[in-house]
Amino acid sequence: QLAKAVLTIVIVTSSSEEKLARAAALGADHGINYRQHPEWSRQVLEITGGRGVDHVIEVGGPGTLTQSMRSACVGGHIALIGVLTGAADVVPTVELMLRQQRISGIGVGNRRHQIELVRAVEATGVRPVIDRSFALADLAAAFRLQQAGGHFGKIGIDYGPAPGTIR
């Protein structure tokens, strides 16, 4: 949604046609089912006329990084924001160098970044998609849902009232 708010062409990947349809309803221009197309970078290159994309938001991690690199253009940027496929694997460094690409590990950010993000969300009217919320006591169930990959959007954790507040 944020990418669409700044007039970007958005290509999303998912293992689920239902999730791809939901992403399209939220503004995604193209959807690729990576189970049907394990070498999904080929579809990205087809969509972009062989050029590749400027930016990849990589949530899969090691298991999908090579496809993300092959989807990005020469000089493209890959923002690694998740590691759903595992913590470590081989990075094809020669391919990375030949493509002159950059990979950045992106964390949650500091307070200033969060404030800027909230302002951007408010300015664009984007509404974050929250699949489900769990009480803190059900944290294990939230992690199981995330691991199963059945959610669409964010999984929230309700910590309860802030200390000193009355509910």
Task: Give the ranges of each region predicted by the language model.
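Short amphipathic alpha-helix with an adjacent loop that forms part of the alpha/beta core around
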Residues: 38-50
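Mid-domain Rossmann-like dinucleotide-binding core that forms the NAD(H)/NADP(H) cofactor-binding site
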Residues: 1-37
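Rossmann-fold NAD(P) dinucleotide-binding segment
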Residues: 63-73
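N-terminal Rossmann-like NAD(P) cofactor-binding module of classical short-chain dehydrogenase/reductase
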Residues: 54-57
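Short, glycine/polar-rich helix-capping loops at beta-to-alpha or helix-loop-helix junctions
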Residues: 14-22, 87-93, 113-115
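C-terminal hydrophobic helical "lid"/dimerization subdomain
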Residues: 66, 111-167
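Rossmann-fold dehydrogenase core element
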Residues: 74-81, 90-132
